[in-house]
Design a protein with these regions (language model features):
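Structural alpha/beta core scaffold segments of enzyme domains
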Residues: 1-193
Length: 193
């Protein structure tokens, strides 16, 4: 969405956020170049579960957006008469579920180039290119009329591709390099990005 930068240049919001792009002519060269990259960061408080992140004294993660930005009620009928159950038979628990990755089988992949009309063209799987277009154009700093998104077969994304993933990274690399690029996430990157 609009709340996340394409590359986190000021703040890393979560494990797996992209902070740099390494582009090379072969995968071997790319891996060697990536190994040479050195990043200095100031470690911020890390919230390893949702309850810590929404605590009243928690630091704001996304500037201008509350950490608890969406709440829903659990509706399950009339209130239960707890007085009818002895205290010795009552228990109070607090629980939450961790983030569940979508675990689609095919890798997140795509490619991009500048076409004969001078448009940055990105091919990727998506289930909402009409939703992604303004986010990606804004993220890489090009007008929407200079960006073309082509939807490849999406397969079973299970919601993973409802938000843009690699498209902005591909578009940014094409814009900077002015040559064709491709990007294939491995399964670790699929889960953490």
């Amino acid at each position: 969405g609009f709340e996340r930068p394409v590359l986190c240049d000021e703040k890393i919001f979560q494990f797996g956020d992209a902070i740099a792009i390494v582009a090379a002519d072969t995968e071997e060269h790319a891996r060697a170049a990536a190994d040479a990259v050195k990043v200095e960061i100031e470690e911020l408080p890390a919230y390893m579960n949702a309850m810590d992140a929404i605590a009243p004294d928690a630091a704001e993660i996304h500037p201008g957006t509350p950490n608890a930005f969406f709440e829903t009620n659990c509706i399950k009928g009339p209130d239960f008469d707890w007085d009818s159950i002895p205290d010795s038979q009552q228990v109070e628990i607090e629980s939450y579920c961790s983030r569940q990755p979508h675990l689609h089988l095919e890798p997140d992949c795509g490619y991009g180039y500048i076409d004969e009309d001078g448009m940055i063209t990105v091919h990727s799987k998506s289930i909402g290119i009409h939703l992604h277009m303004p986010m990606i154009a804004d993220g890489i700093g090009v007008p929407m009329e200079n960006l073309r998104l082509v939807q490849n077969h999406a397969g079973g994304t299970f919601g993973y591709k409802f938000s843009p993933t690699n498209e902005a990274l591909i578009g940014a690399a094409v814009k900077i390099l002015e040559r064709p690029v491709s990007l294939v996430f491995n399964q670790f990157q699929n889960i953490t990005y």
